[in-house]
Amino acid sequence: MNIQALLSEKVSQALIAAGAPADCEPQVRQSAKVQFGDYQANGVMAVAKKLGMAPRQLAEQVLSHLDLNGIANKVEIAGPGFINIFLDPAFLADNVNRALQSERLGVTKPQAQTIVVDYSAPNVAKEMHVGHLRSTIIGDASVRTLEFLGHKVIRANHVGDWGTQFGMLIAYLEKQQQENAGEMALADLEGFYREAKKHYDEDEAFAERARSYVVKLQGGDQYFLQMWRKLVDITMSQNQITYDRLNVTLTRDDVMGESLYNPMLPGIVADLKAKGLAVESEGATVVFLDEYKNKEGEPMGVIIQKKDGGYLYTTTDIACAKYRYETLHADRVLYYIDSRQHQHLMQAWTIVRKAGYVPDSVPLEHHMFGMMLGKDGKPFKTRAGGTVKLADLLDEALERARRLVAEKNPDMSADELENLAKVVGIGAVKYADLSKNRTTDYVFDWDNMLAFEGNTAPYMQYAYTRVLSVFRKAGIDENAMNDAPVVIAEDREAQLAARLLQFEETLSVVAREGTPHVMCAYLYDLAGLFSGFYEHCPILSAESEETRNSRLKLALLTAKTLKLGLDTLGIETVERM
């Protein structure tokens, strides 16, 4: 259930009954401090200003109309007109019970939408590197959350699978195959690309051949398309290994590369010209946008077709947005692309809106993110200053986690150790990223991310096993407590219960804003509240069986919420650590 939404509706009704306009904002928020209750309604001040009333006077009138019977046991006015709401322990107990009876932990489904999520987007014939990590895992956490809430999600892996570099790559692949080393060379994609580029730069005959191959490929020649597909297939097979290691839900079926939109490009250029949006300028086809000014203060020109007839990324992105609305029937489109692409996307979407390709009712959202930095505050690199391959990063995560786990569990079997190292190591890399606000840069630090204290994956995974251990110690099957009532008598029980019931609100924020760090913060807070509850409210040595069973149920809902919350982030859990 969504308590915030329920209270917003109630406060809104009371505001309207007190004379506020029908579109007033109740501004119900979770309280920052326990002494201000569980929720605060902060909308009175703004409404009082509009009505020319003293805020406190309006707050008193709102209170006289506010019916929170069975929901809150105390409502008070604080300061100039804040309304503090304290939830009724009986309401908390009832909803904890309901959450435990539902596989979805009481989370309701909003009206389902078709949502296209564009994420990961590596390039063909290049290995994935750390620069692909953020888009891949933040996008995937968003996808998992939206799917859990019941939306139809279409994953779009906008792979860089087209462009002039393919002439060079096909020419080099052909050369390698003639020397019977094709497969071997492509096992090292990075080396393959580097060698192809070297030949292109140093051998004029090779470069000439490469340029002619581009023309043939773009003309749809079957032989060159076959060679191109080979490059795409080998790259995506290697990428799939990385996706599987990362526990990311992308598959080969989700690839929607740049090449998909090629057939649309001539028609789009012709249509933009016909609509008077695109004009010829110095031989190129350009759209001038009043919304963006150049250094001279004139409308900025966005090229959609070059002098030589070639198309640009902008043209592809216009086609891409059009396709996602017209063919995929998207109600909403999310792009997980780094912040440096912001202006480029905004310009493409401005053209899309002007051309009427996607209506204003369908949001196109750039969920941008910052960079991953080394401890020196500069972009994360190898010691030699090169780009860090994602596969190498995951290998190191596994190795470090293996050492850490072996140290803490010297008697663990080799298989168990390997599995635990994988869960902890990969989880640590992902959680370190997901727990930071995506809009900011963050410092990649092995020691911090593998620590068993603080807001880290190992701490969260351990917190989950710690809650489960209560049931092992009790020797109780969770189903045996189905009929036991939940009774909230202590403050710490109430605080834990209220936070558990804010799970749906947290999911809603992640779904709306694309900010998985909000879920990480919620789960970390929940683990801390459980710790305090466990310390001050004895479970197994409780004074009565009723209290013991009630507290076991709070522990059970905590375990289920931690597991499900981590699952929406793509972080695995184990039952023992």
Curated annotation (Swiss-Prot):
GO terms for biological process: arginyl-tRNA aminoacylation. Belongs to the class-I aminoacyl-tRNA synthetase family. PANTHER family: ARGININE--TRNA LIGASE, CYTOPLASMIC, ARGINYL-TRNA SYNTHETASE. The gene is argS. It is found in: Cytoplasm. Monomer. It is an enzyme of class 6 (ligase). Gene3D superfamilies: Arginyl tRNA synthetase N-terminal domain, HUPs, Isoleucyl-tRNA Synthetase, Domain 1. Keywords: Aminoacyl-tRNA synthetase, ATP-binding, Cytoplasm, Ligase, Nucleotide-binding, Protein biosynthesis. This is Arginine--tRNA ligase. The keyword ATP-binding applies. GO terms for cellular component: cytoplasm. A motif ('HIGH' region) lies at residues 122-132. Its EC number is 6.1.1.19. InterPro entries: aa-tRNA-synth_I_CS, Arg-tRNA-ligase, Arg-tRNA-synth_N, Arg-tRNA-synth_N_sf, ArgRS_core, DALR_anticod-bd, Rossmann-like_a/b/a_fold, tRNAsynth_Ia_anticodon-bd. HAMAP family: Arg_tRNA_synth (MF_00123). It holds the Pfam family Arg_tRNA_synt_N. SUPFAM superfamilies: Anticodon-binding domain of a subclass of class I aminoacyl-tRNA synthetases, Arginyl-tRNA synthetase (ArgRS), N-terminal 'additional' domain, Nucleotidylyl transferase. One of its GO terms (molecular function) is ATP binding. It catalyses: tRNA(Arg) + L-arginine + ATP = L-arginyl-tRNA(Arg) + AMP + diphosphate. It comes from the Bacteria.
